């Protein structure tokens, strides 16, 4: 049995197909471009939990190891997920390395593992390992 706490309608819909999953969905404002649930209500809801694994996504990673996004509302939710998780996994595709964005979510040192969609430049792999983050290229 697995309990999934999410701020994503899409993730909830996929997980709900498995009857052994207990799916808990945050309340808040639906962001139409990706069906993410954001806002103060979502943050307060997520803050009620202490989860083993938190999974976040981002819009960019800069050369200092800052994790970046464009939507300040999603950033607040991602920060809350980081605070409430024993281990934090970042899932991002290769295009996000070196991509600028306006709002800082966190730093590489705040996550435990990074999952990406294939080989990345050595400078990025070195930066990731330098901060003690496990790197998985899948």
Write out the residue ranges for each language-model feature:
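Conserved SAM-binding loop
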Residues: 4-5
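Conserved phosphate- and dinucleotide-binding cores of soluble alpha/beta proteins
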Residues: 9-138
